[in-house]
Amino acid sequence: MPKKFIVANWKMHKTVREALAFLDEFIPITKGLNGREIGIAPTFICIESVGKVLINTSIKLCAQNAFYENKGAYTGEVSPAMLKDCGVEYVIIGHSERRKYFYENDDIINKKIHACIKEGLKVIFCIGETFEDRQNNKTMEILKTQIRNGLLEINSPEALTIAYEPVWAIGTGVVATEEQIKQSHLFIRNQLKEIYGERANEVRILYGGSVTPENIKSIMAIDNVEGVLVGGASLDPLKFAKIVKY
């Protein structure tokens, strides 16, 4: 059984100084914690500094994004090869904020997943429906489309983690109900089984969307929830430590 995976997505927060101050407080109070894997995804500008600290811990260095080419005239982009060189192990691909603000579609996301896996990186592939999708009973249809298109010709389930993040629950304080999470995670698991057969069990499915120290226990008790992707609550070392220690 894979370890539970708890990932901090800092988004566009923390200077290098603030990131290092977080680690100074967070690492000692979570040291020696067994039975779970912890990941932290800082901004690109903090990756090298954070990575130098994490190298002496079991915490995994994650990135929030990557481009689908390893080099070239792509102003402002960062390649999988560059991230790997900095010690990154996991890359978040397909986050709803990337889809919304940077117009990333399933084709771009699929190319990014291919590029990261080819470089030996593991991928945290984000999927999720909007509030309008759920109101129109299209949740499963949307999830199926995102999974099938995003994982097209991806034959390495051992390199994949899926993060189910209903868009309407991200940063809103609104958490999907236990039944909604259970149904969606079961659907995702079954989709993965259709694609990968028994190898689908190698893929962890995380929940993301207003995860807090107050709701982490109930979320982790839901079937097929094998971790969480944490946004706002991961910015505070004490709050994130409480989530990790649930």
Curated annotation (Swiss-Prot):
From the record, what ranges are coiled-coil? none
Q: Which InterPro entries match?
A: Aldolase_TIM, TIM_sf, TrioseP_Isoase_bac/euk, Triosephosphate_isomerase, Triosephosphate_isomerase_AS
Instruction: Enumerate the residues binding substrate.
Output: 9-11, 171, 210, 231-232
* Keyword hit for Ribonucleoprotein: no
GO terms, molecular function: triose-phosphate isomerase activity
Q: Which Gene3D superfamilies match?
A: Aldolase class I
Recite the UniProt keywords alphabetically.
Answer: Cytoplasm, Gluconeogenesis, Glycolysis, Isomerase
Reported EC number(s) for this entry are: 5.3.1.1
Q: What reaction does this catalyse?
A: D-glyceraldehyde 3-phosphate = dihydroxyacetone phosphate
Tell me which positions the record assigns to the signal sequence: none
Identify the pathway: Carbohydrate biosynthesis; gluconeogenesis; Carbohydrate degradation; glycolysis; D-glyceraldehyde 3-phosphate from glycerone phosphate: step 1/1
Q: Which residues cross the membrane?
A: none
CDD domains, from UniProt?
TIM
- Where does this chain mainly localize? cytoplasm
Q: Which PANTHER family match?
A: TRIOSEPHOSPHATE ISOMERASE
Provide the assembly information.
Answer: Homodimer.
The text of the family note is:
Belongs to the triosephosphate isomerase family.
Q: Provide the function of this protein.
A: Involved in the gluconeogenesis. Catalyzes stereospecifically the conversion of dihydroxyacetone phosphate (DHAP) to D-glyceraldehyde-3-phosphate (G3P).
Q: What is this protein called?
A: Triosephosphate isomerase
